[in-house]
């Protein structure tokens, strides 16, 4: 059975938003319910394309599927139509900092609440697909949250086969209000997968997501065949999100995916006209997994995410 439906969100003065999703119920027998979400950030096109491609594949092969897969390719439709990075343009809030949401809150909080209630709850597993947004260079990685179900989340994240994997502690989460954190708090194994950068619809980034999705489906026995054991990733114990105190012109000095030592130069932030640049150095050894690729940075603007490795690169 293939069913198309909508998550209906009352946005108050902004009307009612309908977020489309499709549920494919397999014909090969019983199995778990996996939900795949994408487009939490509306300009991360590689991840959205991967969700669409996965859905097209599942539509063609329900007879091979054991269990249920729900796919929501674009949950942040206001950002998608407006081509807006990072936030819901109706309120300027980051949807992936708004979960589990609030039915009486702002637009982002209402969308997050509806997605939590209609898509996350009731799932056995959740995968949230992302990519580097419009001004964001990115090294492919997965991350999951510390929780009572983290071992299951870790096993699925490993099956996704990306080169870096971050475990985020539940004590002082760097990323709060995310889909995967909300799922973990509900006891649902979940992880976030990142592939693609700068809002570019690159085929290799899409295929990297699809390779991981297919392997997780086999790992969960939703699809026939043995899951592939990929080369172990570089594992990271949390990360440091580095920001600039002042607005200015950001010039990175490192590339994503490269190991840096404590004290290494990561980049500089300079005044638009004249003045000495401010050096940005690594507070600890780590690997930049994403870097703001735009030279324009606001005060308190995010520069990069430095992940702390716990095994050898």
Describe the residue ranges of each PLM region.
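Structured catalytic-domain cores with a bias toward divalent-metal coordination
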Residues: 1-313
């Amino acid at each position: 059975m293939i069913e198309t439906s909508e998550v209906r969100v009352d946005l108050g003065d902004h009307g009612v938003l309908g977020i489309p999703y499709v549920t494919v119920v397999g014909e090969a027998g019983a199995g778990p319910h996996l939900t795949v979400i994408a487009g939490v950030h509306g300009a991360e096109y590689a991840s959205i394309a991967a969700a669409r491609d996965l859905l097209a594949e599942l539509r063609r092969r329900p007879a091979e599927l054991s269990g249920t897969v729900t796919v929501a390719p674009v949950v942040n439709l206001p950002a998608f139509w407006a081509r807006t990075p990072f936030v819901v343009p109706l309120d300027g809030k980051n949807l992936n900092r708004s979960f589990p949401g609030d039915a009486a809150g702002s637009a982002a909080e209402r969308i997050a609440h509806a997605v939590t209630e209609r898509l996350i709850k009731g799932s056995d597993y959740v995968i949230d697909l992302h990519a580097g947004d419009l001004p964001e260079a990115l090294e492919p990685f997965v991350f999951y949250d510390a929780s009572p179900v983290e071992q299951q989340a870790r096993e699925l994240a490993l099956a996704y086969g990306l080169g870096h994997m971050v475990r985020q502690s539940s004590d002082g989460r760097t990323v709060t209000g995310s889909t995967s954190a909300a799922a973990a708090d509900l006891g649902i194994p979940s992880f976030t997968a990142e592939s693609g950068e700068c809002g570019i619809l690159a085929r290799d980034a899409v295929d990297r997501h699809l390779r991981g999705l297919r392997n997780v489906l086999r790992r969960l026995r939703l699809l026939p065949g043995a899951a592939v054991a990929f080369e172990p990733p570089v594992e990271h114990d949390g990360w440091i999100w580095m920001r600039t105190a002042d607005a200015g012109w950001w010039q990175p000095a490192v590339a994503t995916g490269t190991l840096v030592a404590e004290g290494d130069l990561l980049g500089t932030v300079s005044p638009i006209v004249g003045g000495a640049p401010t050096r940005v150095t690594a507070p600890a050894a780590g690997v930049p997994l994403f870097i703001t690729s735009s030279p324009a940075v606001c005060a308190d603007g995010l520069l990069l995410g430095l992940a702390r490795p716990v095994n050898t690169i």
